[in-house]
C-alpha cells in the first residue's frame, strides 16, 4: 500500500521550493514543511499518546500533522472555535503528553508539555526524520458530537488514510502541482479531503479562515490573488459563495474540479454550479467520520441532473462494500472503517463490528440503491447535519437541560428542500417567561460556554409540557409539528 510520507518525500526532492501550504501571506515550501515536521517528530518520538494539535489556519497546523505522523504518535486536531469546556473534555479523554499550540490563545487545565511554533522554529533538532508510523497505527483522532454531551473520538488507521488519499488522487483529473482550496477547519474531517490528496499530488494547500467565511469579499480577494484549481468544501459553503454573481467560469477559469462532502448537495445548488462551470468536474461524495471522510462519489453532470432529484451520492470506492439492513440502515464494510471510539468500548460496540478481521460500521443513515447508485434518505436516529457539521440533537438537549431556566427540552431541526437549515429548541421553562427575548438571550449565553456556535438553536418555543407517545416516550414528531406549525 502507498505511504503518504514516502510520496511527500518524493515531492520534497522533486520540488523543494514549491509552496506546500499557504494562508494569506504565510506559506511554507515542501522543503520547509519537511524540515519543520522532522524537528517536531524528534520532539514527539518518545510520546506514547496522540499529540493534541490546537489552532486555526496556521500552516504550522500541517507541520503538526506531518510531524505527528512521522513520529508515529498520531494527532488530535482541535480548532480555536471549539468552546474551552469542550476542549478540556477532549484533553481529559486523550491525556496527551504533548500539545502543539499554533495559536496565540492559552490552554488551561493541562499537565501536558505545551509546544509553540517558536519552539519548533528555534529547535536545534535534525531536519531529517525517518517515519515511524505503521499502517495499522492510529494516524488521527477526530472528535464528533456525542449523545451524552461527551464528544466521541473517532480513531482512523494510517492504512485507511493512505487508501483514502490514493482514491482521491485518482478522482482528481487536474494533475499534479495544482492549487487546492480547503474550507473546513481541521477539527472537521472534511479538511482531510483537501490536505492529503493535495500534498500527495504535489499541490499547494490554500487555507480559508473563519474571517473569509464571514466576509465573502475577503474570499474573493484570495481567489483573485491565487487562482484555484481544486475546490473542497461543504455544499453550504458553495451555496454562500454562489451569492457572488461573479463566481463563474469566465472570472475563475482555473477552477476545474469541485469536491463536496459533509452534507446533502441539493439539486438546485448543483444545477447552478454546472451552469456556471460547464467545463469543470463536480463531485458529490458521502461518508461519515467513522469511515475516513468519504466512501462514495459521483460526477454531477447535466445527464445526472436531468435523471435524478434528489441527487445520488454515487458508487462505493475501491476496497469498501456498502449494504442496507432490512430497516434501510446503511452499513459500511472495509478498510475505510474506523478502529472505534477512543476509550469508549460501549459506544464502539453499539455501532462497530470487528469479527473475522472485517470491520463494519452502522451509519444510522437511511439509504437505498437504484440504478447501481446509492441515495441517502436522512437519519434513522436523532443525528443531523447542519452546515456540514454532524451533531446529535440529544447532546444539545443534554446541555439545554443543564440551564436553571429549563425544565425539559427537545431540539427540532427545521428542514428546507430536504436539508437542515436551523434548529429550534422546544422548552418547558422552570418559571413563566415574562420577557421572551431576555430569556432566549440568557439561555443562548449559557450554551455558548458549553457548545460550538453552530449547535445552538436559533430560537426557542416555550411549552407548558412536552407531548408523549402511548409508550410514554417523548413524541418528537408531535413536538416538531407544534414547533413548525
From Swiss-Prot:
Locations listed in the record: Cytoplasm
Name of the protein described by the UniProt record: D-alanine--D-alanyl carrier protein ligase
Matches recorded under InterPro entries: AA_adenyl_dom, AMP-bd_C, AMP-bd_C_sf, AMP-dep_synth/lig_dom, ANL_N_sf, DltA, DltA-like
Domain of life: Bacteria
CDD domains named among the record's database cross-references: DltA
Pathway(s) annotated for this protein in UniProt: Cell wall biogenesis; lipoteichoic acid biosynthesis
Pfam families linked to this entry: AMP-binding (PF00501), AMP-binding_C (PF13193)
Gene3D superfamilies: 3.30.300.30, N-terminal domain of ligase-like
Keywords: ATP-binding, Cytoplasm, Ligase, Nucleotide-binding
